[in-house]
């Protein structure tokens, strides 16, 4: 199975560097060379060959071999190579997919919105794919499908291999296939020949004329070059350390961990069904209910056996390198040094023909071949010849490598870091050393032109054509690849900058003001060095500005306007510093600042420029982003039109492209956190303490909030217009007999008089609507009434009442606050509250009225507090997909448009709701972690590199313990440092001496100014923490002693700072002064706090058990800090067509068409594989949905196979303890049980429960679900006492979170009764079953099937209990038995009944339905669809009325754009990329054959 590859791998395999858009470190690419194709060994989902879009590639390789930067055709070639992925089985994708957004919020598109989202896609740039799906037009898909061809491959020393390939694959794919197979994996330098003609690596198979079914392709060994020899040695090293997890722990080469196969002890699909009596089901102690603090060691199981056998002691380059002149002329390329496991030492020569042992020793150089000489083309063959131990070990490594699941061997798209790691052995590794010191990015200097032109690559990929599906796949694949490489390079560069390994471009300036260029990427540390942010919050504003800028880049990229370009942007937090990495605009370093900017302002609005081309491009983007074009006055009092915020700068690069940067104010300001004189808060907000003065003035509203706000206003607009029209029609009917003049005047006057009252009524109605949810029948009636009213109005409009219709729309617009009088128009002016900007105020009531624009921004901020926060809390009261940690809570808040700065308000609301106790606890923990992060960043900036581990361990001791926290630095040393006056100079980024900048050269000065422009002239990529609340040293005077400041921190002082920070930033009063009181009051575990904090700031601690209660010695020592890693934020490229297929598939599922839905989602997965490769978060979401559908369709085996892949993928791309991983484990356990793997099912549940308790403790609704599952399976295995412990805990949690009369509680009582009856405790069983019966009766009525089942159960239990009691009484009265005691009838439940109950617990209910039921369900669906259609008709009708009204008044403006704006108000209308599914939630699948309960 050949897998899609990129041209980086092509270079590694063949030396043909053509067509590459670039590559990651070759260490990674060679590692993946032997891993790539494995990903395709198993059919991903449905056996259909995944489509390839390599048609556009053609033979680009040789043409572009020497081009740098790569041009468009080169990128097409790379993308083409990457996309090609078909054998007979489904090609899963690229093992070297280089980037993904780890922060990508995989949001749940609610199933009932799926259809709407799919329909609304027609308003987006992606309409083509959605329309193709909807219309059933498969032309694009047909273009991707191709025929298979079977060829034979003959390699030296192995049997002929027969493989089936796609005719659209490149020859390069066969190289990758051979480098992955066990028998040929050690070959790297070879060519492929057909009829003695060498095949072009970048030719498609279908273009090779002699190639036909059954042709034999020969593998021919080629002579080595210096580069090929180095690649071969690196490949051998990667093969030997293939099983070693060290790279995954060190965060290298996109390797990551997975423990599924460790837990299941092999592939689940290979296991036989187990008999219940043969299962070892005893849970580990740390999994049983009541555990106080879960241990840390089980997080990484079976570490000791992970490494695999050692084949060599040393493999390194020799110190005799490079070969001297005479030896070069004899063909010597390089020398290697090897120590075998037998302790024999060899010096090896690499020449053009291969490898041989020479006669050199450590002291004498003798390059002649050893006697007897043995020349091997492969280094593996030579080492096997000289060392029997190597031969045995290599065979064992290969065997274990091929036994691993394909997904374990594929590189992840993005580096996942571990927050804990074992003590790793540091071995001799010359290649690792070379990567660290010799080269800029591994082997990237081997790409033509050496360093890559990142900006050219990023922009060229965006310019690729996108008209057809194959073109779009090529384009998105290329964008994803280049973006991933850029993120990797930016991350390495940022770490190098902070570690002091990069020279500044302005070395003479103060360290805080320095900027850097490395590998064609511009880096800036963030401090407010030139007082750009003095009025906006100084360093605090400078710290958050890069993050807001990144949000702006994300949304403009999502809109994807042709001709408008953004910079590649990555924000990296590392060692307490924030670094922003950006691609460089061509020519920016050659020009002065003032010459560069042609649009926007470089001084916050004092001087403002505009440009017609920018206005045109930004107006297009603004329609999607709801940005209002507005005019401001420049320094000469001339009006200047803008279609963005004034800070947004436009620069035309030397390449002629129009770039925008500094997008930090893309969205309107949040007035709830700004103290403004001209803003009057509403009474509700004033009572809640708003406005709160934030520490910076860059607070913006989120795009999700604006969409929700516009949608809410649009619904109100429709309702008001319909009510007016209905009343108008009724009045007209009543006034038929009156003269015409009166009849037209009266309604208008009366309506005008009623308007204020109607507004009040509308408000009351909305409040009522929030207080109690409407039933579906009421909604249907009101929808029908609205439709009828508008239909009548339409017919009346057509006759003579255009004026009245216009009046109706006008009133509705006025009521909801539309910017235009006669159209629904909601757009926002991002500059409306910006200080120092002089706006041109339009006439009152018009769209340019400043008062109206301000009111709109205020209303949106008020909507957030009064509507969105309550809606967020209400949504979580059902506990259907509850957040598990701070990250999932943050994602959920963001999906509702709620910024994290509102966390204090959210916590206060949650604190009043006992049923939301778990969410309150998670929110408090997140609050503490974020406050501590602010303090930690300043703390780290004032720490010498020499004392980093001591400082971090001291900080963790202060945060997590109350015992002794003596810092591991002598008091003498501290005293010396405090005496020094220049103590602040130890860390070059913390220097803040007052005017010590030395005179610098003019070239340095000009490059610095130009770089400042590249950064928008603001140097906003700032890196000073918000930790001033801690009172830590951040001023120049304080920096003198700052190097020793960390030693002065104590647990008491740190927690005081945390309390101050939570009050200052979130306006929330923490009621604790130590970790002990905090844990006791709020109920979180210290291990959970440790995990959350390490992940938040990038600390890796040693994997061992920590005693947080220790009173005699510090919990953390220097050696417990293993590493610090970067926390990286960047955008996530989209797969638009895959998303459209996915949403259409969801819509089909909602209609009960499971098979059609399955096929569409399978196709979505194929497209995702094409764009992202085999490993990506969204692929995992697709797999989970497909597994669930397979299960619902009755194919439990297929569900197990797919879900196993979903688990491995989640562990590798999200993390081994990520909330999504826990969800995947619970799903897999259900499918394992359904396939008869009872023991495995329990092990998977134990793992899920352990991870859940580690993250958030036992008090969580998800723990109740897992405990119910464990209890039921233990019950089936006859472990009644264990089962009872778990179900009692589940019952306790269910009662707490769902209430005493909830269905969850009824099920828990029933399970307890079943278990107790099996134990012979009929009295308790009877009592519990009575509770079940009582709940069923009150909730569903006496005649419901569940109530009747419970009644029957009660009858049987009563009978057994009475019989037993009678015999017991007999014994007590007579002292002996008068008759034989009959045995207690305990019949263990059948596996079928247990599975049925498991399905019920997990929300899956299979319903056997008749034809009559099908008809009934179909009519319900049609009614639901009719309601949706009615809503669309309302929209269309209103547009008609507005158009008629405008025509009547000779209006010149069309309503098309405004109508589109209104229609696009709903989420999913195309403004933002909506990801596939909720990473941490349950998909609901309500269909005619299967329903999912809450």
Swiss-Prot record:
Keywords: Cytoplasm, Phosphoprotein, Repeat, TPR repeat. The modification Phosphoserine is found at residue 278. InterPro entries: CLU-central, CLU_dom, CLU_N, CLU_prot, GSKIP_dom, GSKIP_dom_sf, TPR-like_helical_dom_sf. It comes from the Eukaryota. GO terms for molecular function: mRNA binding; ribosome binding. Coiled coil: none annotated. HAMAP family: CLU. This is Protein clueless.
